[in-house]
Protein backbone atom coordinates (compact mmCIF):
# COMPACT_ATOMS: atom_id res chain seq x y z
CA UNK A 1 0.00 0.00 0.00
CA UNK A 2 1.24 3.48 -0.88
CA UNK A 3 2.16 5.73 2.04
CA UNK A 4 0.30 8.96 2.72
CA UNK A 5 3.43 10.82 1.67
CA UNK A 6 3.44 9.64 -1.95
CA UNK A 7 0.98 9.59 -4.82
CA UNK A 8 1.21 7.53 -8.01
CA UNK A 9 -0.50 8.32 -11.29
CA UNK A 10 -0.55 5.46 -13.80
CA UNK A 11 -1.04 6.13 -17.49
CA UNK A 12 -0.70 4.25 -20.75
CA UNK A 13 1.33 5.92 -23.49
CA UNK A 14 -1.33 6.24 -26.16
CA UNK A 15 -0.43 6.89 -29.81
CA UNK A 16 -1.59 10.51 -29.70
CA UNK A 17 0.83 11.19 -26.81
CA UNK A 18 3.93 10.13 -28.76
CA UNK A 19 6.28 11.81 -31.20
CA UNK A 20 7.09 10.70 -34.75
CA UNK A 21 9.44 8.00 -33.39
CA UNK A 22 6.69 6.49 -31.20
CA UNK A 23 8.36 7.81 -28.05
CA UNK A 24 6.36 9.40 -25.25
CA UNK A 25 6.42 13.09 -26.10
CA UNK A 26 8.07 15.52 -23.73
CA UNK A 27 4.90 17.61 -23.74
CA UNK A 28 2.77 14.68 -22.60
CA UNK A 29 5.40 13.74 -20.01
CA UNK A 30 5.41 17.29 -18.65
CA UNK A 31 1.62 17.41 -18.41
CA UNK A 32 1.60 14.07 -16.61
CA UNK A 33 4.06 15.39 -14.02
CA UNK A 34 1.77 18.36 -13.38
CA UNK A 35 -1.28 16.10 -13.18
CA UNK A 36 0.46 13.85 -10.66
CA UNK A 37 1.42 16.88 -8.57
CA UNK A 38 -2.18 18.13 -8.58
CA UNK A 39 -3.54 14.68 -7.69
CA UNK A 40 -1.14 14.45 -4.74
CA UNK A 41 -2.05 17.95 -3.53
CA UNK A 42 -5.80 17.53 -4.06
CA UNK A 43 -5.94 14.30 -2.07
CA UNK A 44 -4.23 16.03 0.84
CA UNK A 45 -6.27 19.23 0.94
CA UNK A 46 -4.04 21.74 -0.85
CA UNK A 47 -4.87 21.19 -4.52
CA UNK A 48 -5.91 23.88 -6.97
CA UNK A 49 -9.56 23.80 -5.87
CA UNK A 50 -8.54 24.35 -2.25
CA UNK A 51 -6.05 27.16 -2.84
CA UNK A 52 -8.29 28.87 -5.42
CA UNK A 53 -10.87 29.29 -2.66
CA UNK A 54 -8.22 31.36 -0.87
CA UNK A 55 -7.62 33.43 -4.04
CA UNK A 56 -4.29 31.68 -4.54
CA UNK A 57 -2.81 29.39 -7.15
CA UNK A 58 0.21 27.12 -7.50
CA UNK A 59 2.85 28.09 -10.06
CA UNK A 60 5.90 26.16 -11.20
CA UNK A 61 9.19 27.95 -10.53
CA UNK A 62 11.80 25.33 -11.48
CA UNK A 63 11.65 22.01 -13.29
CA UNK A 64 14.44 19.52 -13.92
CA UNK A 65 13.67 16.26 -15.71
CA UNK A 66 16.22 13.57 -16.54
CA UNK A 67 15.21 10.61 -18.70
CA UNK A 68 17.41 7.53 -18.97
CA UNK A 69 15.12 5.88 -21.51
CA UNK A 70 11.90 7.32 -22.88
CA UNK A 71 8.82 5.08 -22.73
CA UNK A 72 7.26 4.23 -26.08
CA UNK A 73 3.74 3.73 -27.36
CA UNK A 74 1.57 1.30 -25.35
CA UNK A 75 3.95 1.29 -22.35
CA UNK A 76 2.29 1.75 -18.96
CA UNK A 77 4.06 4.31 -16.81
CA UNK A 78 3.79 4.98 -13.07
CA UNK A 79 4.61 8.57 -12.13
CA UNK A 80 5.11 8.83 -8.37
CA UNK A 81 5.44 12.19 -6.60
CA UNK A 82 6.22 13.43 -3.10
CA UNK A 83 7.26 16.60 -1.29
CA UNK A 84 10.89 16.74 -0.22
CA UNK A 85 10.97 20.07 1.63
CA UNK A 86 8.91 23.15 2.41
CA UNK A 87 10.41 26.62 2.81
CA UNK A 88 8.91 30.03 3.47
CA UNK A 89 8.09 30.79 -0.18
CA UNK A 90 8.78 27.55 -2.03
CA UNK A 91 8.32 23.80 -1.82
CA UNK A 92 10.43 21.05 -3.39
CA UNK A 93 8.47 18.31 -5.15
CA UNK A 94 10.15 15.26 -6.71
CA UNK A 95 9.00 12.55 -9.10
CA UNK A 96 9.99 9.07 -10.20
CA UNK A 97 9.00 7.72 -13.61
CA UNK A 98 8.90 3.93 -13.74
CA UNK A 99 7.38 1.04 -15.63
CA UNK A 100 5.00 -1.48 -14.10
CA UNK A 101 7.92 -3.91 -13.81
CA UNK A 102 9.93 -1.39 -11.79
CA UNK A 103 12.07 -0.28 -14.71
CA UNK A 104 13.33 3.25 -14.05
CA UNK A 105 12.73 5.63 -16.96
CA UNK A 106 13.79 8.77 -15.12
CA UNK A 107 13.31 11.26 -12.31
CA UNK A 108 12.29 14.88 -11.95
CA UNK A 109 12.77 17.69 -9.46
CA UNK A 110 10.53 20.74 -9.22
CA UNK A 111 10.09 23.86 -7.13
CA UNK A 112 6.68 25.45 -6.64
CA UNK A 113 5.37 28.72 -5.24
CA UNK A 114 1.88 29.61 -4.05
CA UNK A 115 0.95 33.08 -5.30
CA UNK A 116 -1.95 35.43 -4.65
CA UNK A 117 -4.14 35.32 -7.75
CA UNK A 118 -4.64 39.10 -7.77
CA UNK A 119 -1.29 40.52 -6.68
CA UNK A 120 0.80 37.62 -8.12
CA UNK A 121 2.91 37.82 -4.96
CA UNK A 122 4.21 34.59 -3.33
CA UNK A 123 2.56 33.51 -0.09
CA UNK A 124 4.22 32.31 3.11
CA UNK A 125 3.89 28.53 2.95
CA UNK A 126 5.19 27.98 6.46
CA UNK A 127 2.42 30.14 7.87
CA UNK A 128 -0.33 28.72 5.66
CA UNK A 129 0.57 25.04 5.45
CA UNK A 130 3.64 24.39 7.58
CA UNK A 131 1.96 22.11 10.12
CA UNK A 132 -0.24 20.45 7.51
CA UNK A 133 2.72 19.70 5.24
CA UNK A 134 4.71 18.13 8.07
CA UNK A 135 3.02 14.75 7.75
CA UNK A 136 3.50 14.68 3.99
CA UNK A 137 7.22 15.47 3.75
CA UNK A 138 9.35 12.59 2.47
CA UNK A 139 12.99 13.78 2.38
CA UNK A 140 14.09 10.15 2.70
CA UNK A 141 12.72 9.26 -0.76
CA UNK A 142 15.38 8.78 -3.41
CA UNK A 143 15.64 11.21 -6.33
CA UNK A 144 19.15 10.46 -7.65
CA UNK A 145 19.54 13.22 -10.22
CA UNK A 146 21.55 16.35 -9.62
CA UNK A 147 19.77 19.61 -8.96
CA UNK A 148 19.71 22.09 -11.79
CA UNK A 149 22.31 24.79 -12.14
CA UNK A 150 22.00 28.40 -13.22
CA UNK A 151 21.89 29.58 -16.82
CA UNK A 152 23.42 32.97 -17.57
CA UNK A 153 21.63 35.49 -19.80
CA UNK A 154 22.26 34.93 -23.50
CA UNK A 155 23.57 37.60 -25.85
CA UNK A 156 21.17 39.30 -28.24
CA UNK A 157 22.96 37.73 -31.21
CA UNK A 158 21.70 34.31 -30.02
CA UNK A 159 18.20 35.29 -31.16
CA UNK A 160 16.46 32.64 -33.28
CA UNK A 161 12.86 33.75 -33.76
CA UNK A 162 9.83 35.53 -32.35
CA UNK A 163 6.44 33.93 -31.81
CA UNK A 164 3.17 35.33 -30.55
CA UNK A 165 1.39 33.66 -27.65
CA UNK A 166 -2.00 32.43 -28.78
CA UNK A 167 -5.16 30.91 -27.32
CA UNK A 168 -3.69 27.40 -27.01
CA UNK A 169 -0.74 28.70 -24.95
CA UNK A 170 -2.85 30.03 -22.08
CA UNK A 171 -3.92 27.96 -19.07
CA UNK A 172 -6.33 28.43 -16.15
CA UNK A 173 -3.88 30.77 -14.42
CA UNK A 174 -4.26 33.19 -17.33
CA UNK A 175 -0.63 32.94 -18.41
CA UNK A 176 1.41 30.92 -20.89
CA UNK A 177 1.44 27.34 -19.63
CA UNK A 178 4.76 26.04 -18.31
CA UNK A 179 4.74 22.99 -20.58
CA UNK A 180 3.98 25.12 -23.66
CA UNK A 181 7.38 26.76 -23.15
CA UNK A 182 9.00 23.33 -23.45
CA UNK A 183 7.10 22.75 -26.69
CA UNK A 184 8.29 26.05 -28.15
CA UNK A 185 11.86 25.37 -27.01
CA UNK A 186 11.97 21.91 -28.56
CA UNK A 187 10.73 23.40 -31.83
CA UNK A 188 13.98 25.39 -32.01
CA UNK A 189 15.64 22.18 -33.19
CA UNK A 190 14.96 20.55 -36.59
CA UNK A 191 13.41 17.10 -36.74
CA UNK A 192 16.76 15.71 -37.88
CA UNK A 193 18.09 16.43 -34.39
CA UNK A 194 15.56 13.96 -32.99
CA UNK A 195 16.12 11.21 -35.55
CA UNK A 196 18.24 8.06 -35.41
CA UNK A 197 17.45 7.45 -31.75
CA UNK A 198 18.68 10.85 -30.59
CA UNK A 199 16.48 12.58 -28.06
CA UNK A 200 16.60 15.14 -25.30
CA UNK A 201 17.71 13.37 -22.13
CA UNK A 202 17.59 16.20 -19.59
CA UNK A 203 16.04 19.63 -19.29
CA UNK A 204 16.67 22.21 -16.58
CA UNK A 205 14.19 25.06 -16.78
CA UNK A 206 13.70 28.15 -14.63
CA UNK A 207 10.43 30.07 -14.91
CA UNK A 208 11.28 33.67 -14.08
CA UNK A 209 8.31 35.81 -15.17
CA UNK A 210 4.80 35.35 -16.50
CA UNK A 211 3.63 36.08 -20.03
CA UNK A 212 0.11 36.46 -21.30
CA UNK A 213 -2.10 36.21 -24.36
CA UNK A 214 -0.79 38.08 -27.45
CA UNK A 215 2.64 38.73 -25.92
CA UNK A 216 5.62 38.44 -28.25
CA UNK A 217 8.02 35.70 -27.13
CA UNK A 218 11.61 36.00 -28.36
CA UNK A 219 13.62 32.77 -28.29
CA UNK A 220 17.41 32.66 -28.02
CA UNK A 221 19.61 29.57 -28.35
CA UNK A 222 23.31 28.92 -27.74
CA UNK A 223 25.27 25.73 -28.34
CA UNK A 224 27.51 24.95 -25.37
CA UNK A 225 28.77 21.53 -26.45
CA UNK A 226 27.87 18.92 -29.05
CA UNK A 227 24.90 17.76 -26.99
CA UNK A 228 24.31 20.72 -24.68
CA UNK A 229 22.35 23.91 -25.41
CA UNK A 230 21.13 26.90 -23.46
CA UNK A 231 17.87 28.65 -24.31
CA UNK A 232 16.34 31.89 -23.11
CA UNK A 233 12.81 33.15 -23.73
CA UNK A 234 12.04 36.85 -23.37
CA UNK A 235 8.66 38.52 -23.61
CA UNK A 236 7.19 41.90 -24.50
CA UNK A 237 3.81 43.37 -25.26
CA UNK A 238 2.70 43.35 -28.88
CA UNK A 239 2.81 47.09 -29.54
CA UNK A 240 5.04 49.42 -31.47
CA UNK A 241 6.29 51.14 -28.31
CA UNK A 242 7.91 47.99 -26.92
CA UNK A 243 11.71 47.91 -27.12
CA UNK A 244 14.44 45.43 -26.29
CA UNK A 245 15.03 47.23 -23.00
CA UNK A 246 11.40 46.58 -22.01
CA UNK A 247 11.59 42.83 -22.52
CA UNK A 248 11.20 40.54 -19.52
CA UNK A 249 13.14 37.32 -19.13
CA UNK A 250 10.50 34.61 -18.95
CA UNK A 251 12.45 31.37 -19.06
CA UNK A 252 16.05 30.19 -19.01
CA UNK A 253 16.88 26.56 -19.57
CA UNK A 254 19.60 24.07 -20.38
CA UNK A 255 19.04 21.07 -22.64
CA UNK A 256 21.04 17.86 -22.87
CA UNK A 257 20.80 15.42 -25.79
CA UNK A 258 22.06 11.90 -26.20
Regions found by a protein language model. Give the residues of each.
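Hot-dog-fold acyl-thioester-processing enzymes
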Residues: 1-60, 107-109, 116-201
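HotDog/MaoC-like acyl-thioester-processing domains
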Residues: 2-9, 64-146, 207, 211-213, ...
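Acidic/His-leaning functional-site neighborhoods
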Residues: 157, 161-254
Amino acid sequence: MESNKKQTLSIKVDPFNTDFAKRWSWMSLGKTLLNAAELHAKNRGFGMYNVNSENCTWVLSRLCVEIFEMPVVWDTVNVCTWIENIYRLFTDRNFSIKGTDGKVYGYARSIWALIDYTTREPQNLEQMYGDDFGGFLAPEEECPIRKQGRVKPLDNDCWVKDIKSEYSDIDLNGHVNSIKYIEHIMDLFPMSDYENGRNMSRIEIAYMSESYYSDILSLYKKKIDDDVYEVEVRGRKDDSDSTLSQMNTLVRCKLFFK
